[in-house]
């Protein structure tokens, strides 16, 4: 009992209880639904995977997904394509925030131009989805969900990677900043990237397996 004018001090410990929430995807049926209840198989590439694998661009992060392969088909111009389930790049629909803003040419030359710092997550759906996403979604759909400005912040990073253990290096500098109003009704996210990759000639025949990238 506690009498008037007296204080009582008690010490107690709270046991940790981790609550895991279901992941939410929007690529399965064009509306937000839990990943567990999605009608099709959707793999999610989050920011943690980009950081763990030291992936600075979208194309590098996609290489770590099952059934997905990003390959360079031209060592002179840097032509790339995403293969899902073995089908060529034109059979894959690429979306940004669930909108098909990628043209056929951008889907070829834009994969290495999307910095990982602007990506919140990437939803990869393997299998046909032409009725939902258009005629290009035969092999699958890649939906890039970008970050939203939630608070004023900024980040500057630089990575340097040795290509094939040789004297060829990949230098990448990225900058992103988030600006929001005082009432949090409007916001702006700014992304910037400067990348220079030296050409890599594996067998010394005068033709680069990886083209120079600026």
Region annotations inferred by a language model:
Residues 2-6, 38, 67-78, 134-138:
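Short, glycine-/polar-rich solvent-exposed loops and beta-turns at beta-strand/coil boundaries
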Residues 154-159, 165, 178-214:
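Periplasmic-side early beta-strands and strand-to-turn transitions of outer-membrane beta-barrels
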Residues 62, 122-123, 142-144:
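Non-catalytic regulatory/gating segments with a bias toward low-complexity or hydrophobic composition
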Residues 3-51, 59, 89:
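Short, acidic, small-residue-rich periplasmic hinge/interaction motif at the N-terminus
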Residues 136-138, 169-173:
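Residues that define the transmembrane beta-barrel architecture of outer-membrane proteins
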Residues 81-83, 99-126, 147:
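Short acidic/polar hinge/loop motifs at secondary-structure boundaries
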Residues 31-33, 89, 101, 161-163, ...:
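Structural signature of outer-membrane beta-barrel domains
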Residues 60, 83, 143, 174-178, ...:
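Outer-membrane beta-barrel architecture
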């Amino acid at each position: 009992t506690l009498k008037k004018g007296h204080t009582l001090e008690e010490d107690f410990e709270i046991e940790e209880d981790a609550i895991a929430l279901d992941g939410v995807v929007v690529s399965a049926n064009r509306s937000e639904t839990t990943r567990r209840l999605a009608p099709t198989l959707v793999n999610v590439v989050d920011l943690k995977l980009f950081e763990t694998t030291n992936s600075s661009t979208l194309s590098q992060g996609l290489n770590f997904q099952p059934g997905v392969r990003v390959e360079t088909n031209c060592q002179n111009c840097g032509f790339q394509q995403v293969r899902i389930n073995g089908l060529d790049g034109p059979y894959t629909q690429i979306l940004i925030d669930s909108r098909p803003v990628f043209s056929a040419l951008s889907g070829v030359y834009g994969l290495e131009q999307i910095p990982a710092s602007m990506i919140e997550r990437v939803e990869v759906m393997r299998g046909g989805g032409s009725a939902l996403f258009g005629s290009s979604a035969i092999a699958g759909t890649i939906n890039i969900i970008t970050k939203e400005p939630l608070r004023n912040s900024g980040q500057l990073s630089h990575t340097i990677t040795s290509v094939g253990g040789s004297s060829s290096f990949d230098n990448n500098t990225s900058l992103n900043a988030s600006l929001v109003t005082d009432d949090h009704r409007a916001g702006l996210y700014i992304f910037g990237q400067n990348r220079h990759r030296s050409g890599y000639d594996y067998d010394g025949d005068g033709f680069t397996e990886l083209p120079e990238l600026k």
